[in-house]
Amino acid sequence: MTTQAIHSVLAMMNITAEQAAGNTLTLSAPATAGAGFMSELNSSIKQINGMQIEARRKAEKFELGVPGIALNDVMVDMQKASLALHLGIQVNNKLINAYQEVMNMAV
């Protein structure tokens, strides 16, 4: 897996997270050398965590009977958070495979 492919996957994760959060789609410029891969990865992990926290909060509010919280909204938010987590796990697996492939290359 090339670095371009990794950046592409991370960009798709960010777009998916933005869409799941209900934000408008914004395409950002490629990360600068200072921002780097690690900051993109941390940002994606924080977005996934934020989605899960928000889904849990909405579920708790629904369980407490707070007006304005519908079951379908709770279920959709929980599915979005679950999907984002599974996507993050798949990206993690791909990164590990890419790392192992690079480490096994003959010099």
Swiss-Prot record:
It comes from the Bacteria. This is Flagellar hook-basal body complex protein FliE. Disulfide bonds: none annotated. GO terms for cellular component: bacterial-type flagellum basal body. The gene is fliE. One of its GO terms (molecular function) is cytoskeletal motor activity. Belongs to the FliE family. Keywords: Bacterial flagellum. It is found in: Bacterial flagellum basal body. GO terms for biological process: bacterial-type flagellum-dependent cell motility. InterPro entries: FliE. Its main location: other. Pfam families: FliE.
